[in-house]
Amino acid sequence: MDVPSGENAGLSSITLHSPPSPAPPSPAPAPPARPPAPLPPGPDAGPGVAVRAQPSPGYVGGRVVVTYTVRNGKNALATGLRLRLGLPAGIPVATLPAGCAGGVCALPDLAQGASSVLRVVLAPDRALRTNVTGTLTTTGTDADRGDNVSRIPLRILQPRIVSVPEVGKPGFVTSVRGKDFPPGVPVELTWKPGITATAPPARPIGDGSFIAQLLILVKDRTGPRTITASGPGFSPVTTDFLVVGGTITPPDEVGRR
């Protein structure tokens, strides 16, 4: 039906609004990052020391070389190495290696498999039994501290000779017997006063002993004399002998061995 235009005068317009869309939810926070796994511990160094002496036994008047060998047998650098020398108090020292003071030697760092060698020369002047030691310390790692101390026994011998018998007349051959000499070294026998007959040197056997002979020349002088044994590696040693004249028979002239 037709509505008169005048009847629309009281109508108002209505605007409809849709409700706002809900905001999207905030994303969940990311889980914290896992810390990196700890690195495995690095390898340890393995420094150790070994000591030896040559010759062993040693001999009065000779030389004994003591060798210290420090070696790193493990897989890391060995650092801060010091070696304490345990040398016998009763034996004079002829030479010390460089870098040693007060019985302690500073050593260079050693890579895996590397070694450092130190040599000490002893000059024994008396017979004795003793020990030689070496003690190693480090400021770095050490996989095995059980090889940081090395100890060896050392014996010093005093060579000596005797004549059997101790009395003889011109033309007599006396026996000279030695003990505690370096095996295999040539030992020259001489006597003074008097003339020493030419003879090959004595050679001590494995136990350091020898038996040699000295001839008293027929026209040689009588009286006391000194037999001397000398050679490399020891100080000369002596024994007394008496040359007699006339009809005196030296003891053991017939039955001596």
Residue map of PLM features:
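Extracytoplasmic/secretory-pathway segments with low complexity and glycosylation-like composition
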Residues: M1-A23, P27, R34-V65, G73-R84, ...
